[in-house]
A protein has these predicted regions:
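HIT superfamily nucleotide-processing domains
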Residues: 1-235
């Protein structure tokens, strides 16, 4: 097994702050290095205060209002999804769309890859985060995986696929209705490319699999490891 190290270091930023009556304020910053590809991430411990200052408390009434106002024109709602969304041709997806439970997958009208599909996760137009059930997420992932297999059958060079999800506008979603996106083709995106190349370099150097070694390290550390479901390890 290779020597996986979680490198991090802390720094402080000092300034005179109007939020503290122009007294000195000190912010703690933590820099973390990715053990595989070496990229650096910065954690600002005071960013939660920035969010609260700029956006205030969550306005649940406003969220409900936006959800209700957007529902009549939502193409992902069950009364619209089969009549207003695009379909795949039979050479890519024999059934034109993929349906698993309440999840329905269809082509993205504005694709960013050779294969780019959207998966409406549920018939319900708006969900609170606590209402995302295991079944809802599992159905969506299964629909996306079925599409991945169909895409590969249509083009065996389409080996680089990702499944992505962001919810509501602060996370970058353009519509309210819960959904996932699955996309890719024969060209990997930068982050995926770096991960694949880093994994190969690690194997050539250590003669072991980085991801198996990472799980072993995480289990021993007992800081982030959650558990295992089938062949899937959760961190």
């Amino acid at each position: 097994m290779g020597n996986i190290q979680f490198v991090s270091f802390k720094r402080h930023s000092k300034f005179i702050s109007p939020l503290k009556n122009f007294q000195e304020d000190v912010h703690l910053l933590e820099h973390r290095r990715d053990p595989l590809i070496g990229t650096m991430s910065i954690l600002g411990y005071n960013l939660a205060d920035k969010v609260k200052m700029l956006f205030g408390d969550i306005d649940h009434d406003l969220i409900e209002q936006v959800a209700q106002e957007s529902k009549p024109r939502c193409f992902m709602c069950p009364e619209n999804v089969n009549t207003t969304t695009p379909k795949y041709s039979s050479d890519i997806l024999p059934q034109e769309r993929v349906t698993v439970g309440e999840a329905t997958l269809f082509p993205n009208l504005f694709p960013l890859s050779e294969f780019h599909a959207v998966c409406a996760l549920t018939h319900t137009h708006y969900l609170n985060l606590r209402d995302f059930s295991t079944e809802i997420l599992a159905n969506g992932i299964q629909a996306c995986l079925k599409f991945v297999k169909s895409a590969f059958n249509a083009n065996s060079s389409a080996k680089y696929m990702t499944i992505n999800c962001n919810y509501l506008f602060p996370a970058g979603a353009s519509i309210v209705h819960p959904h996932m996106q699955v996309l890719g083709g024969d060209v990997p995106y930068t982050y995926l490319k770096n991960m694949l190349e880093g994994s190969l370099q690690y194997f050539e150097k250590n003669q072991s699999n980085f991801w198996n070694d990472l799980i072993s390290v995480e289990k021993k550390a007992r800081e982030r490891y959650i558990g295992k479901t089938g062949e899937i390890e959760w961190i």
